[in-house]
Structures are given as C-alpha cells and as structure tokens.
Amino acid sequence: MAQSCTTEGYLDAMKEVLVLTERRYEGDGSLSNMPQEYVDNVLQEDGLVVDALVRVGFAAKRVAWCNDGIRWDARGAALFRTTWDYFDRWETFSAWLNHASNHTTLFNDAGIIRWNLDKHYLQDLEQEGVAVVPTAYVPKHGHVPLFEVCDQRGWNDVVIKPAIAGGAFDTYRVTTRGDGQEISPEPSNGSNSEELWHGLVAKHDMLIQPFLQDVVASGEVSLVWIDGQITHAVKKRAKQGDFRVQDDHGGTVKRIDVSDELVQLGTDIMERCTRLCHDRGWASPLYARVDLMRDDNEAWQLSELELVEPELWFRFCPPAADALAQAIQGRLQA
C-alpha cells in the first residue's frame, strides 16, 4: 500500500524550485528511524541547497516527491536530492516520475533519471569507452547458478547487488575458499550462497562483480561534478569487518584532495556520459557523483555513476551548492 504524504501548497511557476526528499526526511525528519546524526546530515545537505537557491532568487523548499499537495501540472522545477526510498516503492515512484516529467522541469533530466535508476547503464558507459568494474548481468528469474557465473569469470570473491537499488540494499559479498564460502553480511535466515542468490534473483535483476580488495584497503573515491566541473572529492571507507562504504552501514567519509590525473579521469567520464545523453535527446547532466575504485592492477575503474539522488557532501564544500543553484538559474533562464 502506498505511503500517504502530507499536503503542502502548490508548485508556484518558474520562481519556485522544489528540493525533493522522501517522506521520512520531510520537515524535521522525525519520521526517520535512522540515528539523529544521520538525519541531521540529510537536513544540512538539503538545507545548503535550499539556501543557495534562495540566494539566486528562487523560492525554494524541501518536499517529499510523493507529497499529494503538489500541483505537478503547473510550471516549475524540481531537483532530486534525498529521494532514497524509490526502490522500496518502485511502481509508485515510476508512475509519479512519468506524471511529473510531463509537466515539470526535472533536474536531472527525466530521461537521465530513468536511465540511471537501473545499473544496466554501466553497460552503456562501457560501450562509450569508460573503464567499468567488470560486471555480469543476470535477469530476474534467470536460472543461472551463482557458482557457474563465478567459475566462467574466474571470480572467487564477488559482490552481488540488485540492478535497481541504493544504499547497499540486498547487497552481499560472497567469498569462496577451499574450505567453503563466507557471506557478508550474514543472511538473517542462515541461507547459503546459492539459496541467497536464488532468493535475490527471484526478486530483482541482479549484478555480479568481482570484489576489489582496494575498497577495504584504501576506500572508494567519489568525485562531485556540478555543471561541467569537478568541485570537490571525498573518500569513503567501510567500518572494520565490512565492505559497504555507505554511512548507513557504519562507513565514514572525509574530504580529500585528488590528483590532476583523477580530475581528468572524472571529467572524461562525464564528457562521455554527456555525449551519450545528447545522442538520446536528453539535456546535459546538471550534477553527478563519479565513484571510483582501484582494481588489483591499481587501475581506476568506475563502480557507479550516480545521476539521480547522490549524496554530494555540500557540507564539505558549500560553494558547490551555490554552483548548483547558479547552474539551475542559468538553465531555467536559457
């Protein structure tokens, strides 16, 4: 059953930009069951964007994407930020996206949103020449044993994840050793790897990727890209004994300086992505997060390119929020 959302006013022509969140984080975030520090970070991040939009002349406010009181048939703009429940409510979200995109300017472009929601986009980027973490794709209800894919690829340590999900939802590391297998995190029902795999592929299109040891040793680097330039970068590290770098699972994040080489790599990835978008008739991406890991040969590979609702860590670089607001102003005035 779809979750009900509060009623809040109307979308007021081109002067208003809605900063989209989810129901749990609307208002003061009191409906969330996450730790208060986590909620405070969400509110701070969105608040920095709202304030930046106000500084360039918009009437900006945060609302849940499912807010029943928003008139999407009026002119206006909406910016995806913390809409992290979309995969929990996929059918409802998809219907909303179809409706809103017919009446409202969305950032990023609705075509980009639809494309990037499904991790099969990695195939498209690889075809554009981007070095992507090697990935095997298994369709929902696909009768392919996990061990068979791993044997064919020569992988004995893999990450399995849904094609449509976020925050490491239903994501596991499966390691095969001479004396058996280890699954992290341990399945709550005690299932073995094949039982776990068949349960997941019964629900989702799935991805299988080799586990890259450097994500534990050094972490994952994320480059934040706003309207044509890398504004800042962070490094995410998993907590001891885990591989998931998300703060939902105890991971930590800090701002870092990155080499010119890495900035150029991120820029090149975004140029290739932008060409792909133009070829498909979409607007250029407004914002992105480029997530990179080193492989076992110390070469950088793209793990994900987040174009829907990435955390962009404006609290580490507030001027990037101003750059985002100015870019929105420029596009709406064009």
Give residue ranges: language-model regions.
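Structural detector of well-ordered beta-strand residues that form the stable sheet scaffold
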Residues: A78, L106-F107, V133, V159, ...
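Extreme N-terminal starter segment of soluble prokaryotic enzymes
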Residues: A13-L18
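Conserved N-proximal alpha/beta basic substrate-recognition cap immediately N-terminal to
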Residues: Y10, E22-K140, V144
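Phosphate-binding site of ATP-dependent enzymes
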Residues: F169, T176-L276, Q301
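ATP-dependent carboxylate activation and anion-phosphoryl transfer catalytic cores
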Residues: F243-R244, E261-A334
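Rossmann-like NAD(P)H-binding beta-loop-alpha module
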Residues: G129-P162, A168
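Short, solvent-exposed loop/turn elements at beta->coil junctions and helix N-caps
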Residues: C66-G69, P210-D214, V290-M293
